[in-house]
Regions:
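Catalytic phosphate/metal-binding cores of nucleic-acid and nucleotide-processing enzymes, i.e., regions
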Residues: 1-119
């Protein structure tokens, strides 16, 4: 695949993630910006309104063959004070998300405590 085609494929997925977040978070489209391909840092730049609802640092990968460990490391390096999350996609497969296992379990523990009426 040509470099330009690969970048276009990545850009489409990055914009898809952006659009999904805008819709689900109910924020203004200008509150989440898609970073240009090849630029350093996290893939989605969020304004305060979006970050308050979704305190994560996003890395997007749309590749047929992917090193998840390198992708996770890249997301962590770019995450600053936010939890790193990697959105991954390949042809004819649904998108997936990679997060730290301990973080994911803690999220679930919070949900269980809320369901049980405990704080």
């Amino acid at each position: 695949m040509k470099t330009s085609s690969a970048k276009a494929k990545g850009r489409r997925f990055q914009q898809w993630v952006r659009d999904q977040l805008i819709e689900q978070l109910g924020v203004h489209p200008e509150d989440i910006e898609s970073r240009s391909m090849g630029a350093g840092g996290e893939d989605l730049i969020m304004a305060r309104a979006a970050r308050e609802k979704f305190p994560y640092s996003i890395e997007c990968k749309n590749q047929e063959s992917l090193n998840v460990w390198k992708s996770s490391e890249q997301a962590t390096e770019n995450s600053g004070d936010y939890e790193p999350v990697v959105f991954i996609k390949r042809n004819n497969q649904k998108p997936l998300v990679i997060v730290d296992a301990n973080y994911f379990i803690k999220l679930h523990e919070k949900d269980l405590k809320c369901d049980d009426g405990h704080t």
